[in-house]
């Protein structure tokens, strides 16, 4: 999910 604090940072 894309939130204000990035949830995707762990997914390089």
From Swiss-Prot:
- The reply to whether Disulfide bond figures as a keyword in the UniProt entry is yes
GO cellular component term, pick one: other organism cell membrane
Main location class: secreted
Source species, domain of life: Eukaryota
What family is this protein classified in?
Belongs to the snaclec family.
Role noted for this protein: Potent platelet activator that aggregates platelets via both GPIb (GP1BA/GP1BB) and GPVI (GP6). Alboluxin induces a tyrosine phosphorylation profile in platelets that resembles those produced by collagen and convulxin, involving the time dependent tyrosine phosphorylation of Fc receptor gamma chain (FCGR1A), phospholipase Cgamma2 (PLCG2), LAT and p72SYK.
Under which name does UniProt file this protein? Snaclec alboluxin subunit beta
Q: Give the originating organism.
A: Trimeresurus albolabris (White-lipped pit viper)
Q: What is the lineage of its organism?
A: Eukaryota, Metazoa, Chordata, Craniata, Vertebrata
């Amino acid at each position: 999910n894309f939130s204000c604090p990035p949830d995707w940072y762990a997914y390089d």
